């Protein structure tokens, strides 16, 4: 390592009695080396077994919405068919997942739109989904009405945080009607929204498949809207220039084959 530091004419580690710590230059080098090593490992695993499916691993980044309404069933079927494959699942927002695809940390991402994807990354639409407005049981009376987005603004709102693509998406929907999205409660993850709705903290937009079980149990109520909320998509994002192992290719192809 000393030789490498001399060749690069820079310090990569700060050495102390407690161990070593990467310098900013070392962090940058580590990021590039990590991506190369993961690609090398994927190639090594593929070559070690011509079938590629008796062992190996697949690294996937998934948003919670994509995981809950699309990916879980695909992972279950894949694991039953190929139990020797190790699955590495990362909980990412859409931007985080796309960045991980770019850096080579994951084989591909399954996320919800909108997704900003630039070449050489490619995007495959897998499944459309509709989001609905829901509230807790104290809002039951609204279930027999039909609200405009302007009227929705009169009630407390729950949404994901402002740094998420979902927030930006709904902010653009409200702006298209001359309104500003100003939620009273911001959740860190999509899975937090439904419990917050049940606790009567406000109204929220949820994917219909995620809301359906609670609607059937009458734990929440759907509130009809006068204004149309555009359909969104679950999509798969991958790097067309990044080599995938056989297992990752198989899971990717299985996911694409199962698109709606």
For each of these PLM feature ranges, what is it?
Residues 141-142, 156-177, 244-248, 252:
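Secondary-structure junction motif
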Residues 51, 120-157:
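Flexible hinge/capping segments at coil-to-helix
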Residues 7-8, 29-51:
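Alpha-helical linker/hinge and terminal dimerization helices associated
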Residues 70, 221-260:
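A late-sequence structural motif
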Residues 59-61, 131, 147-167, 259:
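Short loop->beta-strand "edge-of-pocket" segments that line small-molecule binding or catalytic clefts
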Residues 5-22:
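A short LG(V/I)-centered, amphipathic sequence patch enriched
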Residues 93-98, 102-105, 112, 166-223:
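Hydrophobic hinge/microswitch elements
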Residues 55-117, 187:
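Central regulatory/effector-binding core of bacterial HTH transcription factors
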